[in-house]
């Protein structure tokens, strides 16, 4: 067997391979014999079919499989088992010239890790949200919890207000005949009138109505409520751009009866952990602060990645890009019960998501370079801390039980280690970047300006 390794691009190599028919013959004969053991041909005992007949019937397909396997083994021997080159992603067979009982000529292309020279980051600015929890934040959260615990009391005579719950039936009406359209009716729909996803036309029509009222209203031809109502409209109509006429029957109106803010309420929402109002407020403040800190870090991490990609435009091997695109397609499958949707255009999907795949591949290369240069590692103590945080100190599920669950799935354990490693990379970058802290008000104003600028650029784009 003759092999030649050549550089095809700054991040790709090609392995050219030539093998004679004599070199392939032992593997081909072995594959033919394996096929013969399972063959059941009339006139011959099972497993006793002449090898020549096996070859005549299946030789071409078997030969191709043998050739592919031979090329893969050559790649492992010539590339993977040496320290000269570190391949990235899966190799691609770009050429295979082979006929049964003839020589084999093949070319494999594979990606390699490019050199990444990290730039000086001391003058690179990023914005970090510095969230300060106010008393208003605490009171808003308490009010939210009270609303969650509230009882819904039916109103007999009072009209619906914009913070009430209304249950209705919707019957579409034919405007030409002024009669109900049979089969076009939705029943038992419940809406919270202060839900910003609710169609404004329906909200305005329902405010002021009472249980037992019936009225008509024109609504947009799409579902007249909102997509998260819990009931999808069962009928599809040809879109004509016109509103549709509905008769609305109000079944009931309910209003929230907020529980008093007392020790009993505190015990209920904390499941008995607290019973003191002041301690309850302090606990809420700490939880809000923790949640906002986490959100601030996540937003800053996104900005860090954008800055690092901008500063380090390293080339990404095609095999790495394709690997990420494969994972995107796999995610679509998992979101659809293990199958791609019937109308899924994979080629268009891959083209549309190619930039994201390339960016993820580039960030992976930059991140790995930081890990190598800084000798970042994940200790067993850090893994144990992760599981302890996941358990949250709960008695029902201990850190040890969570760890045992993860250990049954090596891929999950690998994700845990990579998550911890990524946190260390971000810590390293935050220490070296010029981080400017901003209040929530300043941060939201800046984000709004950026969104407006982005929208303006999109409008000006050809």
Curated annotation (Swiss-Prot):
Domain of life from the UniProt record: Bacteria
Predominant place of localization: cytoplasm
Enzyme class: isomerase
Gene Ontology MF terms in the entry: peptidyl-prolyl cis-trans isomerase activity
GO cellular component: cytoplasm
The PPIase FKBP-type domain, residue ranges: 163-259
Coiled coil location: none
Origin species: Salinibacter ruber (strain DSM 13855 / M31)
Keywords annotated in UniProt: Cell cycle, Cell division, Chaperone, Cytoplasm, Isomerase, Rotamase
Protein's name in the database: Trigger factor
Stretches for region Disordered: 439-462
BP terms from Gene Ontology: cell division; protein folding; protein transport
Compartments, record wording: Cytoplasm
InterPro entries xrefs: PPIase_dom_sf, Trig_fac, Trigger_fac_C, Trigger_fac_C_sf, Trigger_fac_ribosome-bd_bac, Trigger_fac_ribosome-bd_sf, Trigger_fact/SurA_dom_sf
Keyword Cell cycle applies: yes
S-S bridge residues: none
Family: Belongs to the FKBP-type PPIase family. Tig subfamily.
Reported function: Involved in protein export. Acts as a chaperone by maintaining the newly synthesized protein in an open conformation. Functions as a peptidyl-prolyl cis-trans isomerase.
SUPFAM superfamilies, alphabetized: FKBP-like, Triger factor/SurA peptide-binding domain-like, Trigger factor ribosome-binding domain
Alphabetized NCBIfam families for the sequence: tig
One Pfam family linked to the record: Trigger_C
Low complexity composition bias: residue spans: 448-462
Entry's EC annotation: 5.2.1.8
Domain remark text: Consists of 3 domains; the N-terminus binds the ribosome, the middle domain has PPIase activity, while the C-terminus has intrinsic chaperone activity on its own.
Record's catalysed reaction(s): [protein]-peptidylproline (omega=180) = [protein]-peptidylproline (omega=0)
Gene field: tig
Keyword Cytoplasm: yes
